[in-house]
Amino acid sequence: MRSFLISGILALGLMATGPIALAQDATTKYVRFSHDGRTGFGILDGTTITALDGDPITGAKPTGKTIALDSVELLPPSDAGKVFAVGMNFASHISSASDRPPPLFLKLPTSLTGTGSDVSLPPDANNVHFEGELVLIIGKRARNVSEADAMDYVFGLTAGNDLTERSWQGRDLQWMRAKATDGFGPVGPALVTGLDANNVLLTTRLNGEIVQQENTRNMIHKPAKVVSYLSRYFTLSPGDMIFMGTPGRTSALDDGDVVTVTIEGIGTLTNRIVR
């Protein structure tokens, strides 16, 4: 699957060179990866990763060491302690009222998997649907923040696929099994700063065919509203993720299907479904 991974990143390879700048005044791509048995962070420039001495969200600097992209396994781009999600956030999918609180649910850190990885379905998961989504990644502790200040607490963006078992979703009391099963939260390929969360194009493909495509400007509950609302009830910590909802129609996946989620400026998240 590594060929999917590399081509997806290069397709939209925006990168700011030079010293790392956590002020987010430029577009920069950060990746989290496994290499030679170790987990690290780096800045992606084309097919080269410049290794960092720590997590860019909490503070890091380049080490000067470079690593070839095709020699690493890309992991979820942050070490998320909490994974929130918004439902019914596009009228083209299922809409909710803009003057009401955003509908929320949780995924689990163990739901997360990186680009290029296979998603192995439980044997009784027979109605799993793709849901391509924009994902916010929190940059600093947030509690009771205003909507006006909320985006100051977002470090950057990535792409996600909120895989969902529709039969379980309709039958179970809670959505935990349907939404938070291991592997049901692919994210990546990179954590990107400097993008406008309210204006990026999201495209989902199933086996190369476009099945979802919409601009995030059409989100009903905007990122600032969601971050502010969540922070009333939950402490948001650096690295936490917020899935922002899916547009359009979804459909069930079969063994061997390849789902890609492309967001302009971020790149392409690619995963294969395996039974």
Question: What do the PLM-derived regions correspond to, one by one?
Answer:
Residues 135-138, 144-160:
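RNA pseudouridine synthases
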Residues 166-275:
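Catalytic-pocket segment enriched in acidic/His residues
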Residues 73-75, 94, 119-128, 142-149, ...:
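A generic local secondary-structure boundary/capping motif
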Residues 1-4:
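Positively charged n-region of N-terminal signal peptides that target proteins for export
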